[in-house]
Amino acid sequence: MRGMFLTLLLACTDPESPLPSPVLGEPVHVVPSGGLPAQVEVQPSANNLDVVRHDGSVFFAFRTAPDHFASADTHLYVLRSDDETHWTLELPIFQGTDLREPRFLSLGDQLFLYFAVLGDDPLAFEPQGTMVTVRDAEGRWSEPEWLFDDTFIPWRARVVNGEPQMIGYTGGEDIYNADGMPEIEVRWLRSDDGLSWDAVVPGQPVVETGGGSETDYVILDDGAVVAVTRNEAGDEMGWGSKICRAEAESPGDWRCVADPRKYDSPLMFRASGRVWLIGRRNLTDDGNYDLGMRDLSFEAQSIQYELAYWQEPKRCSLWEVDPEALSVSFVLDLPSRGDTCFPSALETGEDRFSVYNYTNDPEGPDLSWVEGQHGETWILRQDLWFE
């Protein structure tokens, strides 16, 4: 018995023993599906989404519009379910302009939904700011109100160690403006009530300035922060992404390294003792967004990289992030194709998740990203676990 115990102990502590590997369940259709309420009018494009568990139910928000691009016909729907199959309409949102980035925050008996308001020009990215609506304990939603006084776009909202936090960015109107070096600000915020927000790092709401926009992060056991920022606009570090880290004693001092790949719509989480990322993958030989054309001007590079990226197929993928080396390794693709990747996930158990994502038909033709943006997209969910 003693020998068996020692063998098991050595196996558990052997650094050479294999680590748990990710496993994907079968995808399930959420949008469109027969489980949606009749009041929900699904248009060809269903994409930006979020999901959260609140008051014993699952709440799901998604955007639907004629296509991927900005539209005055955009609707947001908030649905509720007890089984993630049959859904009840909680709240429709329509404002005659584009709406994106729905983000939930469950706080006590209140559920907050933040969302970005943009213009309706399909050829422009025109952030107007963030609005919020609140569901009270009786299930009543408030009228949406403006939350910030600038063009802030929320990217993730969650409770971290008991504290509501949000990360997002301002200056998004510069992402597709190739005229000069951008000064987009990534802001890391905290709140006591979900409505009034200030800096996580006292006196320092901005943790990164440059070309970075969409950003997600995790907190390690030692309190260090590891983050992935989409750097589509480019800056002195190049284009693609930034992989960043800040130590617990100085959480506002982000040290970043450049990655030439662009992990659009980053979702970060921890499982099996490691750091994971779900984000878009460019289906080329090296996957790079930054093509290294340094003989061109900054403005010309920005245009060339964007045009090249639009012409390639995409996947929504699981990646592993090394929190020490600040490097990212490809792991596997979710069922995805064409216009895809705006993930959200529910934790369903230890190292188990229900992942929601949008895509063109994953069994259909391998469309370029721009082709897919004009096509029909679905929202799927599937289980992800580690064994």
Positions of PLM-derived features:
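Positively charged n-region of N-terminal signal peptides that target proteins for export
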Residues: 1-3
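Hydrophobic h-region of N-terminal signal peptides that target proteins for export
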Residues: 5-14
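Beta-rich carbohydrate-recognition and catalytic domains
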Residues: 13-47, 52-100, 105-265, 269-338, ...
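Active-site pocket scaffolds in enzymes
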Residues: 340-342
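Hydrophobic, well-ordered secondary-structure elements that form the walls
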Residues: 345
